[in-house]
Amino acid sequence: MKNFSSVLIGNESLLIQCAERLLQGGDQIHAVVTRHPDIRAWAAERGLRVEAPGEGLADRLAGVSFDWLFSIANLSVIPQAVLDKARLGAINFHDGPLPRHAGLNAPVWAILAREKQHGVTWHMIAGGIDEGDILKQHLFDMAGSETALTLNTRCYEAAIESFAELLSDLHGPGPQRHPQDLSQRTYHRRLDRPDAGALIDLARTGEEIGALVRALDHGHYWNPLSCPKLRIGDRVLLVSAAVPESGHPAAAVGEVLESTMGGLVVGTGSLPVRFTGLSDLEGRPVCPTTVAQAGDRLPLLDAVTARAITQAMTSVADGEARWRSRLQSPEGIDLPLVAAASDQSRWRSTSLTGAKGLEGDELLAAVATWVARVSGKAVFDLAYQDKAVPDAQGCLSNWVPLQVSTSADMPFAEFARGLTPLLEHARRAPAFALDLVARDPQIKALTVPQVGLSLSGEAAGIAGTALTVRVAADGTLSLWYDESRLEEATAATLAQRLERVLETLGDPAARTTPIGRLPIMSATERDQVLYGWNSTRC
């Protein structure tokens, strides 16, 4: 048996399983490249060198000599300079049968395609993504009830079994290479999503609808794509299961045949389908009897609307990773005398003055500076609403969590420069999928920041905020406040403080002043504090 040395790259537990096989067989692992803390901890416990992926990886591995590179559950493209370091070659694990389902999330797309067979593939890294020669492939039949969760589990098991066979070849005669027939290739991109944000088209057959729901069922694990959705009246609800049922009377497409705690039975393009596990977009359960009754007609999804939703969802998909991270770790503020959010907002507004001399991103930075001063926080989230937010029929947010970071000794000009790239990202991806909370177990709830910053023309604050500063196209400002959460006098004081900050920063000479030294009290409030509240009788 010919033992060899290796470097492993990946971010899931499958890497550990394969690494243990290597070590048990007497092979050497010269480095593990990962961003996953559990894998880093395991590697450290095993006494293995650990490197983070990303910029400079080839330089950091400059002194590492190895035979094989294994890419296992790794979703990032490996730099060619790193691949070139492997003396014998680089091998990738793919959770689908190549060339039929190349790219990402192969199990999901296989179920959506209603495939009869699936499998896993170990292949050489060469040419384009997932195009290299096949070394080992395990195929298996798919059950009719397969979900993304069950199919991923079966892929995991097949990966471990086939890796043992791959090692036998590498230890013996060498890799057995089989070129792919790329004419049979289907490639699934990172940003590919089911059509119409996975909103169910009831005109489809019951089998197609069931496949959509099963394909997006990841159990309690992270769902990287979307949740299946059903429009009921003016609400968009999530669906956990959809099973075609015979034995019901003929029904029109969208007609509700049954509404009980056991689910909704609705007419489709073939058999009626029973929808169960209804919840709102944050994953909170919804009883079917509260949203529809037998005899109701659910709205149908026409082709024009479906295309518009697909385009809207696609336009913001690239920003999802950033907003997901922000929603996982919200940085809230707690302004004094502001109550918790209520079910019914009552918006009032007041015009603001003092913004003369400020425009564009500097004006927005001045508003953020005011929030930093009145909240006393150096790091906080603002609900940012751009002037152009795509419409996905209730499937997208109309704001994003803009995380602001500053310090008392940071000059305003420096802060404003640092805020610009954050604003640019928010403009490129001004919304996130509202089912993101239900898809990610690490997001406990959708936390809307207390303060919003809006560039839209809507005559109200951002839903869920207590205060929203609205910047009109001509640069004029208004402060919208929810009077169910704070009194008029409190809003007036906050407005005066914002005007004081704007007035000060309207002078270019003041923009080099550290943020912590910018005045926020108006003359009236200052006199009240110094000579009103603090006055004493002799």
Task: Say what each PLM segment does.
Residues 1-35, 41:
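N-terminal Rossmann-like dinucleotide-binding module
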Residues 2-5, 127-243, 309:
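Active-site-proximal loop/hinge segments within enzyme catalytic domains
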Residues 4, 23, 201-316:
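An anion-binding loop in the catalytic cleft
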Residues 27, 133-139, 187-197, 301-308, ...:
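Acyl/amide activation-and-transfer machinery of modular secondary-metabolite enzymes
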Residues 52-127, 131, 209:
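Alpha-helical oligomerization interface recognition
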Residues 292-341, 426, 492-538:
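Flexible, non-catalytic linker and terminal segments flanking ANL/adenylate-forming cores
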Residues 357-358, 374-465, 487, 511, ...:
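His-Asp-centered acyl/peptidyl-transfer active-site segments
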Residues 378-385, 462-519:
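Extended, hydrophobic beta-loop-alpha segments that form or line the acyl/peptidyl-thioester binding
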